Amino acid sequence: MLALGKLLELTLAGREPAEKTQLTVEGVRMRWMGEGALEVRPPEARDNGTDLLLSAGIHGNETAPIELLDELIRSIARGDLKPRARILFLFGNPDAMRRGARFVEQDVNRLFNGRHLQSGGAEALRACELERLAASFFSLPERYRLHYDLHTAIRGSTIEQFALYPWKEGRQHSRLELARLRAAGMSAVLLQNKPSIVFSAYTYDQLGAEAFTLELGKARPFGQNQQVNLGPLRVCLEQLIEGTEPERDDDLEGLQLFSVAREVIKRTDAFTFNLADDVENFSPLEKGYVLAEDAGGSRWVVEEEGARIIFPNPRVKNGLRAGILIVPTDADSLG
């Protein structure tokens, strides 16, 4: 196997490869772009016009998707996978990966769409570098651009695998992309309705990619992800890489769709959730329930029918989102 197939091993060791560019026996070029970054380019005659960005490890302790990307990279380096797409593999936060931590000082996935310019430190610099790598990769005109940013969650979920679809003014969410997500094993998709500062929102908003944050189960240490079922996603990614996707219609039967009702913002250190510490994502909330409280008598009361909570985290920094209230929606407004 080519040495660049060991990108994860190099990244965890903090080492650069001796050779920055290598070719497989099929003529696929693998090029080391920097720490945790590998570009894969098929021979020109096999290139099908797809640019696929696959990122994981934005949170360093979310190891199942990191291991999945490692397996795909190794398969390409061995010649088992024969790409027809250009691919950029990114391990988002190498320092946190080496520590087995979500982040070191700052959550990298709150530093995109220019937010890193308002901050400092190594993780702000890393977010800037990830934006640069993505922008360079997606700079070729007239190509199909797709980005999957792969995560696992810090808590359990009543819907284990789901996606978040970013928003941009004047741009419709795609039924065909949602159908692909369903085939990849996603049971639900949250359709966002405002700008965001996560990685997939940057590539969607600024670079014109179809982009998604995929939540794939519970976060566990390296080597302990046997319970995370990534089989359907892996098949989907292999098909995208090799250009062998079957034709599929835009039938969304069985895919649950949600929209954002409100974001819960933590204003002060007095903020508290009236939820159990182990509450799961997508837990239902009764209308009239006092969800959260903050200083000055501020209260978050559930007003929506069918509301659920995702990503509740009272320990975020003041001014950041501490949770999202979501409600069921349908596919009537999709493109």
Swiss-Prot record:
NCBIfam families reported for this sequence: arg_catab_astE (TIGR03242), PRK05324.1 (NF003706)
Lineage of producing organism: Bacteria, Pseudomonadati, Pseudomonadota, Gammaproteobacteria, Pseudomonadales
Record-level GO BP terms: arginine catabolic process to glutamate; arginine catabolic process to succinate
Amino-acid positions noted as binding Zn(2+) in the UniProt annotation, renumbered to this chain: 59, 62, 151
Function noted in UniProt: Transforms N(2)-succinylglutamate into succinate and glutamate.
EC number: 3.5.1.96
Keywords carried by this UniProt record: Arginine metabolism, Hydrolase, Metal-binding, Zinc
UniProt-recorded Gene Ontology molecular function terms: hydrolase activity, acting on ester bonds; succinylglutamate desuccinylase activity; zinc ion binding
Entries under InterPro entries matching the protein: AspA/AstE_fam, AstE_AspA_cat, Aste_AspA_hybrid_dom, SuccinylGlu_desuccinylase
Protein's pathway: Amino-acid degradation; L-arginine degradation via AST pathway; L-glutamate and succinate from L-arginine: step 5/5
Catalytic reactions on record: N-succinyl-L-glutamate + H2O = L-glutamate + succinate
Active site as annotated: 215
Family classification: Belongs to the AspA/AstE family. Succinylglutamate desuccinylase subfamily.
SUPFAM superfamilies found in the cross-reference section: Zn-dependent exopeptidases
Superkingdom: Bacteria
Name of the featured protein: Succinylglutamate desuccinylase
